[in-house]
């Protein structure tokens, strides 16, 4: 979905973004990202060298030698069929998805869930696809990344019936109020905030961020959508997460360099614990393909 994934990874490195979770929807894009990712990382290294050289040249003679090449972000994959495409989740695709979950680069099943705003798949079909992928995530020992839009009641009820995965549940790109956030937090979920946290009229989203325990908070971009302020209206990239993180520091009162560093370290630790974990027993088993 990004125009130039390699360039975006290089930009992440330049801005100190150390971890990226990319999304694969096999009903929409197939599994091409799995094959393309090594090439993107190689291209990103070349882009990064060019960026550092250009920055050094701008600083004058010898400037290009003064900055070491920053590391590219670690990249993991969340794979799952989005509720928009639930109508395309056949038994064969479920089986193919299950095999891809054995790839040790995969760290979550998602985005999965319900979208009653667009209703691009019939609601009963969305619910069945959601259930099927919750079960698959639990079998694989992986967390789920949720897309919920105007469907939080049904989504929560389904998770309560199926059982929240022990590996974790991440409510993606949260843009509602504290009352809604509370029940997900009480159920042990992580909450990720993206661009909406920065929107000028979204005080209810900032209210929600204040009630989420700091060890359950993540930041994200939902790139190429939901570009944060002050860049709203432009195409969003993963590196734009720095704007959201800056606003989250303000919202939570991290108003000194030391407090900001502590909070940002906690956010990174949360993402690493949930999404950059060691291979699961499922992933260590031989493929059944």
Give the residues covered by each predicted segment.
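Mid-domain alpha/beta scaffold segments of enzyme catalytic cores
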Residues: 1-289
């Amino acid at each position: 979905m990004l125009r130039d994934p390699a360039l975006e990874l290089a930009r992440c490195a330049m801005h100190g973004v150390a971890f990226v979770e990319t999304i694969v929807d096999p009903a929409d894009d197939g599994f091409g990202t799995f094959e393309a990712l090594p090439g993107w990382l190689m291209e990103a290294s070349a882009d990064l060298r060019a960026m550092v050289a250009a920055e050094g040249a701008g600083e004058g003679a010898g400037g290009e030698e003064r900055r070491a090449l920053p590391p590219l972000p670690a990249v993991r994959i969340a794979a799952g069929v989005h509720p928009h495409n639930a109508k395309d989740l056949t038994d064969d695709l479920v089986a193919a998805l299950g095999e891809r979950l054995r790839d040790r680069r995969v760290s979550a099943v998602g985005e999965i869930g319900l979208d009653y705003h667009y209703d691009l798949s019939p609601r009963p079909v969305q619910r069945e696809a959601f259930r099927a992928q919750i079960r698959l995530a639990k079998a694989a020992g992986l967390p789920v990344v949720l897309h919920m839009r105007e469907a939080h009641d049904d989504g929560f009820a389904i998770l309560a019936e199926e059982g929240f995965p022990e590996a974790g549940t991440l409510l993606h790109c949260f843009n509602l109020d504290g009352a809604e956030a509370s029940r997900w937090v009480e159920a042990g979920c992580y909450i990720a905030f993206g661009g909406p946290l920065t929107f000028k009229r979204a005080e209810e989203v900032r209210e929600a961020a204040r009630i989420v325990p700091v060890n359950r908070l993540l930041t994200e971009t939902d790139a190429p959508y939901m570009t944060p302020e002050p860049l709203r209206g432009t195409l969003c990239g993963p590196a734009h997460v720095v704007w959201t993180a800056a606003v989250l520091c303000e919202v939570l009162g991290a108003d000194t360099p030391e407090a900001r560093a502590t909070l940002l370290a906690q956010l990174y630790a949360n993402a690493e614990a949930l999404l950059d974990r060691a291979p699961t027993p499922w992933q260590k088993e031989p493929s059944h393909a």
